[in-house]
Amino acid sequence: MTKPRSLAGNVGIAVFVIAFFCVVFAFFSASWLVSDSRITGAKFDRLGLWTHCFRSLPDPNDEYIRRFFVGCRWIFDPFTKGYDQIRGYLVPGFLVFTEFFYTLTFLATIFCAMLVLLFFLCFTPDHKRFVQLTLVIGSTLTCAGISAALAVVIFALFGNRGNWMPGHANNFFGWSFGVAIASIFALLISGGLFLVETNIQQKKRKYFKESQTRFEMEQETKA
């Protein structure tokens, strides 16, 4: 008879699904920092990790203000003239670190998605590698949560300072940033639940081995 997964493992799957979608939305969406839409004449609109949107941004490298950037563009856009020349302005050091840590989070989450599918579809507690699988999932998700936390803290400290995006007083953290915060908790909770599942299954296996040993000793005594 196949042993059932514990409640921790089943809840861990559900929380991981939430974490997965939070990470994906935060990674690809462009609303980490947004401008108040009620402000007329604002130069900045919104931005994410990989996309910047402007209403009318003057070229910061042009002292005569002859060129403006309008609309949403990928930060590595190769087609807009002059966009590569302001990349240092668009992607300062703190944003590079934010992108780095949240990219690690994204990759770890994708990796765990494959492992969670194995856990859900193919592995049962009877499988000899079940404990190792849950340990890897739990540890990786916990590390992903820590990496996401680092990304969020860095962006929170430096993302809305007055020396970066124009209209600082009217800018605020958007829904993408909120989703990134939610991803931290979802990742850490799901990682913790998978580690609890690991501990439960280890104890069950230890108890089963001890029971089997006692049974064998009793049989030998009777014989």
Task: Label the predicted regions.
Residues 1-48, 52-58, 169, 178, ...:
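Intrinsically disordered terminal tails
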Residues 29-100:
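A surface-exposed beta-alpha-beta supersecondary segment
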Residues 59-75, 152, 189-201:
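Juxtamembrane/interfacial segments around transmembrane helices
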Residues 73-81, 104-122:
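Short, charged N-terminal helix-start/capping segments
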Residues 83-94, 120-133, 202-221:
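Cytoplasmic juxtamembrane regions at transmembrane-helix boundaries
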Residues 12-24, 99-116, 133-158, 177-191:
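Alpha-helical transmembrane segments of multi-pass membrane proteins
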Residues 1-11, 87-100, 126-136, 169-178:
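Membrane-interfacial loop-to-transmembrane-helix junctions in polytopic alpha-helical membrane proteins
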Residues 26-34, 119, 147-165, 193-197:
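Helix-to-loop junction signature of class
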